Amino acid sequence: MSDINSNSYDPYHHPQQHQQESQYHPQQQQQQQQQQQQQQEYYNQQHQQESQYQQQSPPQQQYDNHQHHQQDLNQAHNSGHGRSHNSGHGHSHGNNYSGLPHLRTQVGHAQPYFSSYNELNNSGDISNSNNNNNNNNQYNYNNNNNNNNYNNNINNNQFNSSVYNNNNNNNNNNNNEFSIDGKSGITIKHLLNNLNRDSDAKKLAAWISVMLVFTIYEIFYGAYLESLGLVSDGFHALFDCIGMGIALLAMLVGKRGISNQEYTYGYDRWEVLGTFSNGCFLLFVSFFLFLESIERLLEPPHIHNHGRVMSLATISLIINIVGVLFFKQKSNERKQQSSIRSENLLTISHHILVDSCTSLGVILSSLVGQAFGLEISDSLISIIIACIIVYNALPICIKTSAILLQTTPDQLKININNAIKDILVMEGVIDVTDKHFWSHSPGNIIATVNLLTKKNCDDFTLTQSIRNRLSFVQDLTIQLDKEGKHNSHSHGGAHHHPHEHKEDKKSHNHSHGHNHGHSHGHSHGGNDDHEHGENCDEEHEPVPKYQVQPTSPFSSHYTDIHSNNTPIPLYKSEQDDEDDEDDYDHDEHHHDHDHDEHHHGHSHNSSHSHAHNH
């Protein structure tokens, strides 16, 4: 026992033969030699398996761990390890193997173990202790094996975010193929279907196509004739085609008419936005047209070959007049429906009208220049055209901008005020605390109304009455707040209570200043009685000099109490000791502070200053 447990004992080293070996029977020595050979073969086999194990995948390693574990148990059981030489040659085979403990490293392969002669042939206590150690080793091995299996399962079944994101992106790409913004579900196929079903959009697309072809021809032909008027009219028409293309896109997208997670109110605002941008584009064109006209007034250009210029401008004028008449008629038809389509078509007709005016200006300037040689006629007509554009486009920009800014519609302000007055006189209504009215698109009004009502108010009846009164609102949200309902709030502060007591019996004035600071975070309850009677002498226990004055701002002159109700003597200054020597009387003053059954979420730190004037 002492040999094994000593510091010099080495289980991996075979000790020298000593006296105990001479007592062994030759057969026992032969058995021991066979056991050593088996151990050496086992070590070589494990070393070979280790090299193969490291080349396998994690699932195969996990499977081999289990197979190696079973082989180790069977081999240890068959080799006769774990014997207990308590008496005679009895053997006890169980789960505790002293000869071959199954220790594995992090990768799961078995480690060699060499038992000595003393370890194999010692007393029962030694064998039992070895068995206990092997029990611990076997337990550690099982834990390590379970951890390895768990880690392998995690590695094999772990969530791969990159694969998930790729699959999700593929699904989104399939759903939103050729999507305009990538997330709204507006595809080219959807736009083509709307174009096929919308007669206004179909005619606008046809007109834009014809006008675009003619505009490109006008630009190149004007450059060939060196006519600045034709080139300017061509670029002006090109910008108008771009603006009308925006209006066409707004018409097609706004036709969708349904909502989703991205556009919870639907797509009506697309057409509003397109109309607003189109009006702003008209103002931009009129501004530069005005600048160009001023420049041509100062330096009139010389136009060559007025006949060809007039013929090309006449063709452009005819196309524009047809477009103005058509879209103006459509705008009047839609105006009766109070829809944004009317505003959009009106803006388009203004675009075409501007093109018609510019074409007419080119024709008139060519006639005047050819007949009278007056070159400034083109510039004068261009200024008139710019003023007409501003007159028509500015109200459209103001109206659509008001919708985008969610202002209250002007035509509904009177109805809204009358409705609010009627709601205030309804049964159970105390006040209208908040109200919002705005237009999502022309003819689509949205509103939210918050009311303060009485406690016994019938919410359902009141809500139905309000909805009937605000029937002109398409999307109405009503919130009712009961009377006496307060929102939770937190408060804090410092209170200063000055008290001054004057006594007639004695010329003795007392002024008490109470300063209470509140710091939240503690709850306290107690019963504090302070009584001041006649000839009340206050005596304070002297404080040892080694105590230091407290520097905390929360210190006070009251006695603090531990959790076990033990009073703690507080610190006092020298001035307090001098004040304690004075005897003062308090007549007819009784202060009673009762804090029973009140739990406050704060602690009171009070400082009382006493000034005595004798």
Curated annotation (Swiss-Prot):
Q: Which residues form a coiled coil?
A: none
Keywords from UniProt, A to Z, are: Ion transport, Membrane, Metal-binding, Transmembrane, Transmembrane helix, Transport, Zinc, Zinc transport
Q: How does it sit in the membrane?
A: Multi-pass membrane protein
Could you give a single Gene Ontology term from the biological process aspect?
zinc ion import into Golgi lumen
- Extent of Basic residues compositional bias: 80-92, 487-499, 507-523, 600-614
Q: Which InterPro entries match?
A: Cation_efflux (IPR002524), Cation_efflux_TMD_sf (IPR027469), Kininogen (IPR002395), Msc2-like (IPR045316)
TM region(s), chain numbering: 204-224, 234-254, 271-291, 307-327, 352-372, 378-398
Ranges of Low complexity composition bias in the record: 17-64, 121-176
Region called Disordered, residue ranges = 1-103, 115-178, 483-614
- Protein name according to UniProt: Probable zinc transporter protein DDB_G0269332
Organism for this UniProt entry: Dictyostelium discoideum
